[in-house]
Structure formats: structure tokens, C-alpha cells
Amino acid sequence: MKGKLLSFTLFGESHGKAVGILIEGLPPGIEVKVEEMKAELERRKGIRRFSTKRRESDEPVIVSGVFNGFTTGTPVTVLVWNRDADSSYYEEIRNTPRPGHADYPAKVKFFGYNDYRGGGHFSGRLTVGVVIAGYFAKKLLERFGIRVRAYIRRIGPVECPQVEPEELFASPNPYCPDEDAFERMLEEMEKARKSGDSVGGTVEVVAINVPAGLGGPWDEDIEADLASALFRIPAVKGVEFGLGFRFAEMRGSEANDPFVVRNGRVATETNNHGGVLGGITTGMPLVARVAFKPTPSIYLPQRTVDLERMDEVELRLRGRFDSCIVPKALPVVEAMVAFVLADHLLRRKAWEGVVR
């Protein structure tokens, strides 16, 4: 993923030797603590009973770009070994693409040379690197008081009521600030698990203390950059900011956010636009929602095609699957938002150095 000043490249495959990330553009002097990085990676494992039975230790190995506990300003490379991959079953289904997965288009794209085991490079396993990128971005944002947090807004038909940013950031629950809604979400995930099926959901992400002035029109649009980043996450099928698609039902008099003065600075009375106008941050909390489709790998029979015989066949998957990926997606969504914000913040600071 390439920003103007920050970029990262993911490498590895789900069942390969390792996965990892190369991050370029990080300034020198960011303090790095491996235990903090590991804590972020632990969050990516989600709620155990609804996650894959694949158990990876996810020990990050910093290969370059960090010395004596601080970034050096040169490219950062971090490696995470794959220790618990089981590829045996994937040989049986290599010619029967799994519905909902990238198996078929990937085979076409790469002329059949792609690593099909566990989804290969298309696997959610690659988000290990995304979370690592997010760790570095969050450390940079911390210097300016910017914080990013995501929570589960919906699982299937169960929705968490809208929460204020203060309530979200004060909540001890790492998944959802509304305990009643969270219990009902757990029940919905359990129903899917027991039936051999899966369930989708929505993640809401909020960033606070974001200064006004990040972004710009057209190619500099921060919403466009955020949406592009969020859509790169496997299983994401929708992104909206502020009230999003609800704007289509409203009048301008309802939708507009009146400007007011709060504590000596310009703010808006409401935040329907999610902290962005004209592709530029307003100084209000940045709010986005991300829709995740249900995990495509399920234990129920599905129809597919045998690509060798060109026959329609029934596919019954065996393996280790998530019944819901939404809980483990929280640090991934945070990471993408933090990385885009960090890139735009560095751009803004460059301008400030010239103009001011």
C-alpha cells in the first residue's frame, strides 16, 4: 500500500514459511517495544471459540530498520514465522474453487502458478503484517495525541447502539462497549458455529484528536485514501463515513453539521459527515464503518465446478475455519486507518514547516 510518504509491502503466503512486511518512510526516533507489538498481534487472534483452530505464536522478528529500540529512518522489515499450517487437505480441492474465496480468479490471474494452500497470498493471514504496520503508525500518532479505536457495531442482525467517542475509548471491553449487545452478538456467532455456517458483521472505527486540515481535494482526498486502504482488507465489502448511505434519505437541513465554537476552537454541533468535508479533516472525530462478509469457508455443502472436468460438483470443506472474522478484524481496521492518518499527518507537518 503506497501513501505519499509512508508505504508498506506485504509478503508471504498463508502456508508458506513466513509472512511479513516492509515499511518505508517511517521517521527515525519512534520507540519500538516488541511486547507491545505482540499484544497487538494477540488481538488479531479474536475470540478463540469463533476463530480458526490454527494456533500461531506470532512472534515478530525485526529484521531491519530498528536499532537500540528506536526506528532508524531506514526501511523496517518484520518477519513472522508460520508454525502451524496444515496443507494436506488443499491438495484435494486444488481444482474445485471454494465459493466466496479468491481461488478461481487467482488461478486465472496467475495462470495456475499461484499458491492455493489456505488462500496463499490472499489469506487473512497476511493481515499480521498490516497489524504490525498499524503498530508503528499508532506510535507515531501518539506523539500528537491522536488515538484510533475500532469496535464491533453489528454481528448479523444484532447491532450495538451508537456510542459517543468518550464512551468508546473509556470502555474496558475490547470488542464492544455495550455489554448487552455484545452478549447477543456472542449468541449469534455461536449459532453460526454450531450450524457449521458463518456470519458477517460491521466494524466501526473512530479516531479522535485528528487535527483539521489533513487531506485535500481529488488525489489528496483522505476519505478516498481511507476507503482504498480499508477495502484492501480481506472480506471487506463496504465502507462508509459518517452517516454514509443514510444521507440518501435526508434533506440538506437535516444532513448539514452546523459550525459552532467549543473551547475556543471551531467545531460542529453534530458529526454527520464523520469528521471529513471536501476530502479534508474538520477536527471532529473521524468515524467510518466497514462491512465484512461472512467467512466463505463453511462446513455446509456448497456447489462449485471441477476445473479439470468442467463439471458442477458438490464441495464439502474440511479444515480449520473461523465462524466469524469480525472480532479479529478490529486491530486490522485500526491499523489501516492509523497508517493513512500517519501518512497524511507527515504531509501536513511538511507544509507547516514551510508555511509557518
Swiss-Prot record:
How is the co-factor bound, per the entry?
Reduced FMN (FMNH(2)).
Q: Which leading EC class covers this enzyme?
A: lyase
Q: Which UniProt keywords apply?
A: Amino-acid biosynthesis, Aromatic amino acid biosynthesis, FAD, Flavoprotein, FMN, Lyase, NADP
Q: Name one GO molecular function term.
A: chorismate synthase activity
User: Could you tell me which InterPro entries the record lists for this protein?
Assistant: Chorismate_synth, Chorismate_synth_AroC_sf, Chorismate_synthase_CS
The pathway that the record names for this protein is:
Metabolic intermediate biosynthesis; chorismate biosynthesis; chorismate from D-erythrose 4-phosphate and phosphoenolpyruvate: step 7/7
Q: What is this protein called?
A: Chorismate synthase
Q: Which organism is it from?
A: Thermococcus gammatolerans (strain DSM 15229 / JCM 11827 / EJ3)
- Gene it is expressed from: aroC
